Every structure is written in C-alpha cells, then in structure tokens.
C-alpha cells in the first residue's frame, strides 16, 4: 500500500538576527517530506539546524521563508480552531529528560495537564484511567503516577516524556535527540519502545539525532544536514551501504565497527578545519572548506539537492555531470588563453 505524504517542507529558511546587521542562517533553504507511518531521521553535527527545523514544524518559530504543509495545509496559515487541532496532532519528545518535566508536579499531574487543556476523555475519571494506560504502554508501573520526576532514573524520565507526548493521541511526533542524554545501555530500550509504539499506534516520527549508529535502527529514511543545508536524503539501508555525499561518508566512517579485523583495515575520513559560522557561511558549497573532494566549481556554484539515483538525493557537484562538465570546459578555456 502506497504511503501518503503527511508533512512536506519546501524551501524552508529560518534566520535569526544576531545584532550589528548580522544574521544567523540556522536553516537555509531545505526541502523534504515525511510519509505517513514512517520514521524520518534527521542527522548532523551540533549547530547544523536540525533542532531548529523541528521547532518550526511545532510552530514554535515562524519561518523566514518557505513553508510547511501538514495534510496539504500550510501550518503557519491555520485558523485558530485549526491551530488548536494541529497542536494536538503533533507532539514533541525532548532531549533532556531532567529539564523537560516539571519537578513540582507528580507524574499523574504531568500527564493530566495536556488532557485537561484539550478537554479529552470525558472528564476526570476517564483521564485518570488514561494516565494508567499511558504508563503501562511505556513500560512503567501505574503506581508511579504518585511520584515526582526526581525519583526516577534518566531512562524512566524519558519514558514519562514519551507518555506525555502520547497523552493527546498524536499522529506525528518530533523526537529531538531523545536518547542522547541517556546511558548507552538505556538508549536501545528507548528506541525499541518508540518502534513498538509506532507499530501499535501508527505514529509518524521525525527522529533528530547526531549519532548515526542509533538512527540506523529506527529510521526508514534519513536526511543529512550540514550548516543549515540538506546534503543527502535516502533510505536508511542505502545511506549506510552507499553514502554519496563526502560529509555523510565522513560521518559514517567515524562509527566504530565491533569486528577488530574490519575496524583496523577500513579507512577513516578525517575532516579538516572547523565548522564555519552560520553567520558567515562559505560561498558556493557550504561544505567545501572541509571537503576532501572539493573542486574549484564548489566555490563558485552552490549545489542543488538532486536525485542522483532512484530515491537517493544528494547536493554535491560530484554527481552533477552537466554542471561539472560546463565548469571544467570553462576552466580549460581560461587556461589556454
């Protein structure tokens, strides 16, 4: 059965005023879509704009340019009634399970709050029953409802955060690095829980992360961001087997392999230089200052995200034959003068 597009991002830009006439280009013209029932992984190093993208989808930011459509409707042009319904259908799981829960409220009150705001489940009795159901769905004892956040471990707190996100029966969840603050032993448990809940409830996820090793196990498709730009999008399995963009190749080469024989023989790609500032990004390709395959065309022309292979999109001149040929011919002409 063909999956319908649930959310579509087109030419999204999110710029911030940095004072003194300077602008931070946190997100600078990205486009992608998320199909209903899938998990779309969004990866990249800190500062690449992935969390900002998630906040735009939640309508916490008004985009500088471009738009986001949810079920065909522009989310920043909704009526008040439509906005209220949208806010229920899209929820967030936060990165920090310690800071995202109100320490003054019991778990019961934390879960009840969004239900009461939206007037769900027919009154107090129905909501209390829903609290018990939510706790059990995330693997916690219903007796935990009387406790406060400080009484739980990091993994348990994140499960409470997941339960809170599920309280309004959403369709789409933005998971903003939900496992990065957890112990490695707990990360897999949380990922498996999210996969289980997705299967049971038909959820759609935007899974934001900087660690590609864990994204592999939950994502159907993955988008790779660098300095506010989308540089590659493809199916998860293909990205790990055949990465095309030099930045993606470098990220994947840094993931350790358990087999020492393979680990000793494989080539690790070390990127040169530092991450440029989003206030003053490089001309042309923003990755060119660190790219091991940079060409002169990369300074002059910004690459566009194009389909290099079926279902595999990349923004790199290495895969744009026409542009590369045209520029190479121009260089030869200049050299012969």
Which role does the model predict for each range below?
Residues 167-171:
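A short, proline-enriched helix->beta-strand linker immediately N-terminal to the Walker B motif
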Residues 66-74:
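Conserved ABC transporter NBD signature motif
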